[in-house]
Amino acid sequence: MSWSVETYYAFTRKGAGGNPAGVCLCDTFPDDATMLAIAKRMGFSETVFATRYAEGFRVRYFSPAAEVAFCGHATLALGKALAKKYGDGDFLLQLNHARIDVSCTDATATLSSPPASSRPLTQDILERYLAICHLSDNALAASLPAGLAFAGNLHLVLPLQSRSDVDEVSYDFDAAKTQMLTDNILTLVPLHITGNEIYMRNLFAAGDVYEDPATGAAAAAIGGYLRDNQALNYDESLNATLHFMQGDVMGQPCSLAALLSSEPDTPVRVSGEVAGPISSPVLI
């Protein structure tokens, strides 16, 4: 049996860059081994599979290495694919461990993440990952603690003193992959924060990918991390808007926006441009 997979670029910046994702709309899911093989064949950080389910869609995500619980840029790509097939609107998505939604209008899609939260890092874990990233304590920003952020997946956040510090991070891929899989951490996120603007990278050894140009899942999780650390500026409605820049060091510039309330452990709305489908579907 063959499967049709389309390619979309999520979080493009003024029509350029973006993060590619495969999208497979199917009547029934392929078996797990086939979905993993398709993800490997596509070669993107994630490929998303969706089938009709109750009032919405049952959704699963695969990296080239394994299934992942949630992927932001693939969710936006899915939103664009669903809008192409069914028309612009809101779509309910049942993930493995959460229920979310995605909407699409014209070239912009918005997802609602699983509840976003964070917790502190122990010193031994922090030192382990600093060593993996060839960083010292002196590289860390004094204004925020390193931490673990969650919004469907776990992300390790390393706030650094400058954008150039973020750009210069290199890491031991094999050591990172082993440790991240042991600790159930999906990405390492070095970042620099100026007000409500975040410049960051997504190191994805756990998914067999050196770096992901952009991930909405990490953006949502970091929104929760900043909220928990009282690092956001809220409007009169007690909402905060964040702007993320990612992928620059890879030559794949990506822009994301996030909207979240001041209430802890609540979802984050992540938006961005989506381009595609790019070329004809791949039949696998």
Show where each model-derived region lies:
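Short N-terminal binding/cap micro-motifs at the start of the first secondary-structure element
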Residues: 13-17, 22, 31
